[in-house]
């Protein structure tokens, strides 16, 4: 007999381990039980915040060796990463839809979410990889799911869930879910609500959370442009800065992580030593040289700034989808009710993974569309 929806939900939700029980998420610890170093196909994940002087983020302790901040990747590992990186990218048309303002993907929603992620990343001194992962999860989710208009709490809840998952993937010490909601947020979500949203994100992304990012390659490409030697710390800092600035904008969403990393490495090395096109063509064997040069030109032309995340203004009320006068008789009264209102449906497949049920054909629309929330009371975090 097939398991019930509620029992599947309980089983899947039990995997969402937050700091409250001091466990790792998704059983990613190695055979010795160490959580700090995770491996995927023999390739080491990046840990450490360069801008903080190599700290492990969030009280994780300093990482003294540059080798630990940007582990050296082998040729075989890089080739493996390139093969699977596309599975960790948003839909191919996502960037165009964002910039086109067609309405199905709201650029304002993304900007607000990234702005909040950046605030918490800075407050807790998280690693740069954590911040990038949170944005990666956000973009992949938004490229497939359409959040309803006028549900500001949904944007904030999605931001909290994405950053919470990213912190569990990369940080050695993870703040409790309530503590992630710093300052005076408009809405304060309970742990159970955050876990439910985490589950929605996880299932929608097919549980592919150890994403390939530009940080996975940056040491490799910097070494290539530095005669095989470890890159100076200044190069690493500058690379980290550029990668995060690129993540905040929308002009690079179509580029693969390897292409972004190669372009950033070429830009940083060029600023320091005057690397030219011939050096790039000779050094980079795993990426399309034309795409790398195109990405590098975009970096140099646009001079991306962190300010880009705050430049989008809300749409006029007349352009918003739907109506605010939804029937109150069928309106869930809380985020938990909305998340429970037909959103999560699980089924067994060949991979035994929990998946979100498709709502109609073609692109999946958010099941929240049929569950408007009328009460958006301002709640403050009291400490």
UniProtKB/Swiss-Prot annotation:
Protein name as catalogued: Cyclin-D4-2
Gly residues bias spans: 51-62
GO function terms (MF aspect): cyclin-dependent protein serine/threonine kinase regulator activity
Keyword entries, A-Z: Cell cycle, Cell division, Cyclin
SS bond list: none
Keyword check for Cell division: yes
Keyword Ribonucleoprotein among record annotations: no
SUPFAM superfamilies tied to this protein: Cyclin-like
Organism: Oryza sativa subsp. japonica (Rice)
InterPro entries reported in the protein's UniProt record: Cyclin, Cyclin-like_dom, Cyclin-like_sf, Cyclin_C-dom, Cyclin_N, Cyclins_cyclin-box
